Swiss-Prot record:
Belongs to the 14-3-3 family. This is 14-3-3 protein. It comes from Eimeria tenella. Pfam families: 14-3-3 (PF00244). Gene3D superfamilies: 14-3-3 domain. InterPro entries: 14-3-3, 14-3-3_CS, 14-3-3_dom_sf, 14-3-3_domain. Residues 252-277 are annotated as: Disordered. Residues 267-277 have a biased composition (Basic and acidic residues).
Length: 277
């Protein structure tokens, strides 16, 4: 029985890798979902027992699969929403209604995928996690997918999902700051995406800048001790943090320069932040 589970687990991993190479991310996500649901804790073993958690490779495959499955639809949602707004501005209400219907279809797909991975994280993965790195990784993922839900939800739904995202990011940050070095790529990626959450969802650009700058400065201070394995990933994420800081600082300065009496000024356009892929 145990040998059968091991073979099945290896098959799911191989299917996920095949799907990744073919850029068929929905099927990649399905393979990893099947692995999580059917290949963990099959021997009624206690949490933390060998085989009860995802390996680093499996964890990364899961992340890549759902990130890309959601990412394609997030891009579609932005395009369709823009078209819908343009049709409304032109008073083409029939076209606007068609665009709105299509947008709703994409939102339903987005919500389904986000809820699916959130269920896996909450019910299957986090309860079995015993090491700090995986705990940070999974709570960061929870924050990310609640953030994605916030992007397309109505006001009430946005508030609820933003609160869940905030809680998840906070729990990830508490563990990361206590257990992981400031140069660790997972800790840096968490700071990157958490700061994007403050900028794009909570509309707190000053807080986003402070968070990104603190993570960057802390990593610079300890950069001499970065491990060889982490060097490439850490430097890449630090560059993304710096890029966002540059964009956000410029945006804040522009808004300050454009400040005028109420009713006379226009809101400065938002720059789009970069998050960890």
């Amino acid at each position: 029985m145990i040998e059968d589970i091991k073979t099945l687990r290896e098959e799911h991993v191989y299917r996920a890798k095949l799907a990744e190479q073919a850029e068929r991310y929905d099927e990649m996500a399905e393979a990893m979902k099947n692995l999580v649901e059917n290949c963990l804790d099959q021997n009624n073993s206690p949490p933390g027992a060998k085989g009860d958690e995802l390996t680093v490779e499996e964890r990364n495959l899961l992340s890549v699969a759902y990130k890309n499955a959601v990412g394609a639809r997030r891009a579609s949602w932005r395009i369709i929403s823009s078209v819908e707004q343009k049709e409304a501005n032109r008073n083409h209400m029939a076209n606007k209604a068609l665009a709105a219907s299509y947008r709703q279809k994409v939102e339903n797909e987005l919500n389904k995928i986000c809820q699916e991975i959130l269920t896996l994280l909450t019910d299957k993965l986090l309860p079995r996690t015993t090491d700090s790195e995986s705990r940070v990784f999974y709570f960061k993922m929870k924050g990310d997918y609640y953030r994605y839900i916030s992007e397309f939800s109505n006001e009430e739904g946005k508030k609820a999902s933003a609160e869940q995202a905030e809680e998840s990011y906070k729990r990830a940050t508490d563990t990361a700051e206590a257990e992981l070095p400031s140069t660790h790529p997972i800790r840096l990626g968490l700071a990157l995406n958490y700061s994007v959450f403050y900028y794009e969802i909570l509309n707190q650009p000053q807080k986003a800048c402070e968070m990104a700058k603190l993570a960057f400065d802390d990593a610079i201070t300890e950069f001499d001790s970065v491990s060889e394995d982490s060097y490439k990933d850490s430097t890449l994420i630090m560059q993304l943090l710096r890029d966002n800081l540059t964009l956000w600082t410029s945006d804040l300065q522009t808004q300050e320069q454009q400040q005028q009496p109420v009713g006379e000024g226009a809101e400065a356009p938002k720059v789009e932040a970069t998050e960890q892929q």
